[in-house]
């Protein structure tokens, strides 16, 4: 037999073997898909029941269902790992096997997996049920929704906002801190068991694209793309930041620096994530009709169902399907009125078996109107790829899923669309001023959130990479917040806080960079769909409603799910494989030009040195080694606790003696910032009754003077080694300048007199006697009998007059 025949037979044998392997893999996946859909549905349903009725019983049922799903998935993942991907040529089979070979949290031991689930459930419960109570009326308590969110959305009372902001972080963030520390350790262990460097790397793996030549994308490219696009966006953000700062100075004139960062609690919501609610305070042209149509919705008696029905009409108008009957039956579109505790944060659910739902405590506002479009966009994506195999039912990447609803929101927010549904009057006329009003409102929501999103995820990536030590998490959080976002903490926080976890997405284990990438994608999609809709004019005026051409182009992409690389899906819609920020910048170009003109006499950018509490802070310097030598002790958290307690004692004494008031100051009312290793720091004091009431620095100084000796004794130091800068030491007279004007005049007069006396008696008095006589003239205490000595009580050791602390 010739060599060519042997070669042909070999190729046939290889092809046959390969075909058998693929048939076996396909059979395995078909069986998996059927079983997975049933178990996944049961787990998702139990999770839905818990999120819409938070009880111990429902938590237990959710954990049991999740454990069954996890055990099944772990078993199937191990079987999938027996298939060599190199032997699989069918792209669809290969993609499913690769996904299944990633075992997720099942890679942990059963005990650690159970521990992780318990931590996640506990964090979710703390977040969803956390309350902030009024210290003056402990029965008056506020949930986040409804309650605190309303204060942060509408109040212009600086102190009330600060009370809500601090209360949420003190009550919820502090509880989450130890749990979040465990969460980071376990999630990193899980990620490394799945061959990722850390959990941040695991999240970025969602953006990997491979298998199709020219469309590859690795997870490290995501970091580069985010960094580069942020540099392009930053000039627009800086202009917006400067404009908002100027406007907030008009509302809070005593609390804003014209060159500094913005206080975090003044930015429209609990986190400063979206600045949408700042629009009433920052509207450029107030004489124009209000493009926030909340009042019109209320006046027309809109309710939650009307909001979602209107969103559905939008999707149907571009050729996408209606919601299923089960959607309207099973969704939770308003907060229950039966005292159930629920997770109000808006989310879209694809439970499986064609069961699609939305959970949202809808309010009749324009913001919620747009949120409804966003959440229904998720459902449209879910329905579009429902026919894909179970493992490919997902967005091309996580940012795509978030972008779909945002595309519709861009159109739904336009004055043109709002007029068409009767929320703006038919005689509403668009001009340059209404255009700027509209674009500013859009920018407060879209541009204002980008640095927030970028910075939060960068911080988490660094935490997962162990680049930020655990004992510096909060410190680094606020350093990055100041530097990147231009936002400052209104009160200093130590490492007992977990401010990042006070946001739903952090405490509930969501990747967050999706909200950054989605913003880039949504404008790329919008530009392409507007071209399909044959829109003529600026991008910000485009409304794609009623364009089935645009809808079909979008649907073609949605139906792919995760069956191919996202770079290919992006190219199919926009003609490019890469994230591109230019459509976003083009959308806001008229606003950018206007902002630069408005800010021509203002500082653009920010200094990171200023803080709202700086003026009332006192600086402390402590010199342990120079004072105690070999006996010097280390300045630890315990020493700082003792210092804060001693200041609280001084405040109690001061208010008791000087004001005849009993005020229960505690160490928690003494706030420390800018702690340096050598040791120095700043501190100020707030009222125990109201954290937003900062005690004037002058009163704190008086309290320190009154108890200075006691404080020194506590630490074994003195006025020179425990320095309160700006407070004169109390164990010696206050410092006075050596030369003053009155003393100069007095000296001239006395000098003339002395000269006359000297001339008269110079021949009879010796030089030394003359010198002593001159000193006597200048010494008001010369009459005292120094030999006896007189005790000055003001210079006695404080221990003689007071008991030790």
From Swiss-Prot:
Instruction: Give the tissue specificity.
Output: Expressed in heart, kidney and forebrain. In testis, expression is restricted to Leydig cells. In heart, expressed in endothelial cells from small and large arteries, arterial smooth muscle cells, and myocytes (at protein level). Ubiquitously expressed, with highest levels in ileum, bladder and lung.
Q: Where is the Peptidase M2 domain?
A: 19-607
- The disulfides recorded in the entry are 133-141, 344-361, 530-542
PROSITE patterns in alphabetical order = COLLECTRIN_LIKE, PEPTIDASE_M2, WD_REPEATS_1, ZINC_PROTEASE
Q: Bound how, and how many: what does the cofactor note say?
A: Binds 1 zinc ion per subunit. Binds 1 Cl(-) ion per subunit.
What are the GO cellular component annotations? apical plasma membrane; brush border membrane; cell surface; cilium; cytoplasm; extracellular region; extracellular space; plasma membrane
Inducing factors: Down-regulated in hypertensive animals. Up-regulated after myocardial infarction.
Which residue ranges are recorded for the region named Essential for cleavage by TMPRSS11D and TMPRSS2?
697-716
Q: Where is this motif: SH2-binding?
A: 781-785
List the InterPro entries hit by this protein, alphabetically: Collectrin_dom (IPR031588), Peptidase_M2 (IPR001548)
Q: Which residues carry this modification: Phosphoserine?
A: 783
Function per UniProt? Essential counter-regulatory carboxypeptidase of the renin-angiotensin hormone system that is a critical regulator of blood volume, systemic vascular resistance, and thus cardiovascular homeostasis. Converts angiotensin I to angiotensin 1-9, a nine-amino acid peptide with anti-hypertrophic effects in cardiomyocytes, and angiotensin II to angiotensin 1-7, which then acts as a beneficial vasodilator and anti-proliferation agent, counterbalancing the actions of the vasoconstrictor angiotensin II.
Q: What is known of its domains?
A: The cytoplasmic tail contains several linear motifs such as LIR, PDZ-binding, PTB and endocytic sorting signal motifs that would allow interaction with proteins that mediate endocytic trafficking and autophagy.
Q: List the protein's name.
A: Angiotensin-converting enzyme 2
Protein source organism: Rattus norvegicus (Rat)
């Amino acid at each position: 037999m010739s060599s060519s025949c042997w070669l042909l037979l070999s190729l046939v044998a290889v092809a046959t073997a390969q075909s058998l392997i693929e048939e076996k893999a396909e059979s395995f996946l078909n069986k998996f898909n059927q079983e997975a859909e049933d178990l996944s549905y049961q787990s998702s349903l139990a999770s839905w029941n818990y999120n819409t009725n938070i009880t111990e019983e429902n938590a237990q049922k959710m954990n049991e269902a999740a454990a069954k799903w996890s055990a099944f998935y772990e078993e199937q993942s191990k079987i999938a790992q027996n298939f060599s991907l190199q032997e699989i040529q069918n792209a669809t089979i290969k993609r499913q096997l690769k996904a299944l070979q990633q075992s997720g949290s099942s890679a942990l031991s059963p005990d650690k997996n159970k521990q992780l689930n318990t931590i996640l459930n506990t964090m979710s419960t703390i977040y969803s049920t956390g309350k902030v109570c009024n210290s003056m009326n402990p029965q008056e308590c506020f949930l986040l929704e409804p309650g605190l969110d309303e204060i942060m959305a509408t109040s212009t009372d600086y102190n009330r906002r600060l009370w809500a902001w601090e209360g949420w972080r003190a009550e919820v963030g502090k509880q989450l801190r130890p749990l979040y520390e465990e969460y980071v350790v376990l999630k990193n262990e899980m990620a490394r068991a799945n061959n990722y460097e850390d959990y941040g790397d695991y999240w970025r793996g969602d953006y990997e694209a491979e298998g199709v030549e020219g469309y590859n994308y690795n997870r490290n490219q995501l970091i580069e793309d985010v960094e580069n696009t942020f540099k392009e966006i930053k000039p627009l953000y800086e202009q917006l930041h400067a404009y908002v700062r100027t406007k907030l100075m008009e509302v809070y004139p005593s609390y804003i620096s014209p060159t500094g960062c913005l206080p975090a609690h003044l930015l429209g919501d609990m986190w400063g994530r979206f600045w949408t609610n700042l629009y009433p305070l920052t509207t450029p042209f107030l004489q124009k009709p209000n493009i926030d149509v909340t009042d019109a919705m209320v006046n027309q008696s809109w309710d939650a169902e009307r909001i979602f029905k209107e969103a559905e009409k939008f999707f149907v108008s571009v050729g996408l399907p209606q919601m299923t009957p089960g959607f309207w039956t099973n969704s939770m579109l308003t907060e229950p009125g039966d005292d159930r505790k629920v997770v109000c944060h808006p989310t879209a659910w694809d439970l499986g078996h064609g069961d699609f739902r939305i959970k949202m405590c809808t309010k009749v506002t324009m913001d919620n109107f747009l949120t409804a479009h966003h959440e229904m966009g998720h459902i449209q994506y879910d329905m579009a790829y429902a026919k894909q195999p179970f493992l490919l039912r997902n967005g091309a990447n996580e940012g795509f899923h978030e972008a779909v609803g945002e595309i519709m929101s861009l159109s739904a927010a336009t004055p043109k669309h709002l007029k068409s549904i009767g929320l703006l009057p038919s005689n509403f006329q668009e001009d340059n001023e209404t255009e700027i009003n509209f674009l500013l409102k859009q920018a407060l929501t879209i541009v204002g959130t980008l640095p927030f999103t970028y910075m939060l995820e960068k911080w988490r990536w660094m935490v997962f990479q162990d680049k930020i030590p655990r004992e510096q998490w909060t410190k680094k959080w606020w350093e990055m917040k100041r530097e990147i976002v231009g936002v400052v903490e209104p009160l200093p926080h130590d490492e007992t806080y977990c401010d990042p976890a006070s946001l739903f997405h952090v405490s509930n284990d969501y990747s967050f960079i999706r909200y950054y990438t989605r913003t880039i994608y949504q404008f790329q999609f919008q530009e392409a769909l507007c071209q399909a809709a044959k829109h003529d004019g600026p991008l910000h005026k485009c409304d794609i409603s009623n364009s089935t051409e645009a809808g079909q182009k979008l649907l073609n992409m949605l139906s792919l799910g995760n069956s191919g690389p996202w770079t290919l899906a992006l190219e199919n819609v926009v003609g490019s494989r890469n994230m591109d920020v230019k459509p976003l910048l083009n959308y806001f170009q008229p606003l950018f030009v206007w902002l630069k003109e408005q800010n021509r006499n203002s500082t653009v950018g920010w200094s990171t040195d200023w803080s709202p509490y700086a003026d009332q802070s006192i600086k402390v310097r402590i010199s342990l080694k120079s004072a105690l030598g070999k006996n010097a002790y280390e300045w630890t958290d315990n020493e700082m606790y003792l210092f804060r307690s001693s200041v609280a004692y001084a405040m109690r004494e001061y208010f008791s003696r000087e004001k005849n008031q009993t005020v229960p100051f505690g160490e928690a009312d003494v706030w420390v910032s800018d702690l340096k290793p050598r040791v120095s720091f700043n501190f100020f004091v707030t009222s125990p009754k109201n954290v937003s009431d900062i005690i004037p620095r002058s009163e704190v100084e008086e309290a320190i003077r009154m108890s200075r000796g006691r404080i020194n004794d506590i630490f074994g130091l003195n006025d020179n080694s425990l320095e309160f800068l700006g407070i004169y030491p109390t164990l010696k007279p206050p410092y006075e300048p050596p030369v003053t004007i009155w003393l100069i005049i007095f000296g001239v007069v006395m000098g003339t007199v002395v000269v006359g006396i000297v001339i008269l008696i110079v021949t009879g008095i010796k030089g030394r006697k003359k010198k002593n006589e001159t000193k006597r003239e200048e010494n008001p205490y010369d009459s005292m009998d120094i030999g006896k000595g007189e005790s000055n009580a003001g210079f006695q050791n404080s221990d003689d007059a007071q008991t030790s602390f």
